[in-house]
Amino acid sequence: MTVAQTIRSRIMAQGAGKRVRRAQIGLIYCAVQLESGSTGVAFTFPAQRSGQPCGAGLSGQGNLAGRSAGQLIEHLGSEELVSSALGMAASNAVIAECFADPHALGGDILDHLDIREGDRICMVGCFLPVLERLGNLAVEVTTVDQVAKPGAEPAERVERLLPESQVAIITGTSIINNTIDDILRLAAGCREVAVLGPSTPLLADAFRDFQVRCLSGIRVDDPDAVFRIIGEGGGFRFFKAVSYTHLRAHET
């Protein structure tokens, strides 16, 4: 199974019994809140979805509130990116309510990775705060991204860079657009593989067969604040009402 299929299979039974209180699709992120208050977010790929028809899939239906979370989760991995993102956000909300891991860790993601002097690190997706902190270490860092960014290599370079690396730091958004499975195959020789970002599902069990060592995501502490930021087109750097949460996927 793919990563998206594995996540769906692990949580669908719980998701079918949870109702959506509200859902919101912003410019950069979407959010789903359950009746319990548990909330998840996911990236909506604003730069990549311009060729997709307006109102395609779940995003054009206008009646997400009141549905079962399972109805959204089943769209995780859909070719329609916003529908897949809503499926990821609903998955994260269900995981936060039903699968909270007692082994979750706080602090800085770099505190939980086995990074050694001289390591080659390939970052798939550009996380500027992490990149800045890596700059203080005696390592070689290369970033690849689908969107052209200063200092980032084109996405196709990942086929050469990842197999040459000891550490892979992979954006959780790659689950949404179905690129993570190929990326993980390329990272098979890496000593340390981490999946990072607000979209990342904190479900260690779903990654045990995919050599992912660390999951780094968020817990939404103030849903109203997060919905307001997303509704106003804000991105991750404005997410203040969240807690950064990390799991060692093979040690729980």
Please annotate each region the language model reported:
Residues 173-239:
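Accessory, usually C-terminal, subdomains that scaffold auxiliary metal cofactors
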